[in-house]
Amino acid sequence: VLSAADKANVKAAFDKVGGQAGDYGAEALERMFLSFPTTKTYFPHFDLSHGSAQVKAHGKKVGDALVNAVGHLDDLPGALSALSDLHAYKLRVDPVNFKLASNVLLVTLAVHVAAGFTPAVHASLDKFLASVGTVLTSKYR
């Protein structure tokens, strides 16, 4: 459960992200594909090369979903219900991949929000991304 301080930290970090959420989402995907090559199996139809239009488009979806989640911190299950259904029932993504995605998203945010990426912000973002992952895997049960 995110505390009031966690929510404030997450909102402040995403305020610094601004309109770059899609770019950061694409960068995080590239990091994930390089760091965890098995994640590529979910994207056999994508051009996974650096700067690929498909990776950029999917990165925008990831970034937009996270921005939406930040706007609904008090109702993450409601905000992410459709994505949870998609990943559980249609795409059948292995739940461990959400932890991998969280890891590379944290790294990407740390790079771009450097000055504001304090230990407290890091902890809050980690809790937020873990909460998002929990919601996205909730339909697997």
From Swiss-Prot:
InterPro entries: Globin (IPR000971), Globin-like_sf (IPR009050), Globin/Proto (IPR012292), Hemoglobin_a-typ (IPR002338), Hemoglobin_oxygen_transport (IPR050056), Hemoglobin_pi (IPR002339). Coiled coil: none annotated. One of its GO terms (cellular component) is hemoglobin complex. Belongs to the globin family. The modification N6-succinyllysine is found at K7, K11, K16, K40. Red blood cells. It comes from Lyroderma lyra (Greater Asian false-vampire bat). The modification Phosphotyrosine is found at Y24. Residues 1-141 form the Globin domain. Keywords: Acetylation, Heme, Iron, Metal-binding, Oxygen transport, Phosphoprotein, Transport. O2 binds at H58. The modification Phosphoserine is found at S3, S35, S49, S102, S124, S131, S138. Gene3D superfamilies: Globins (1.10.490.10). CDD domains: Hb-alpha-like (cd08927). The modification N6-acetyllysine is found at K16. This is Hemoglobin subunit alpha. Disulfide bonds: none annotated. The modification Phosphothreonine is found at T108, T134, T137. Heme b binds at H87. It comes from the Eukaryota. Involved in oxygen transport from the lung to the various peripheral tissues. GO terms for molecular function: haptoglobin binding; heme binding; iron ion binding; organic acid binding; oxygen binding; oxygen carrier activity; peroxidase activity.
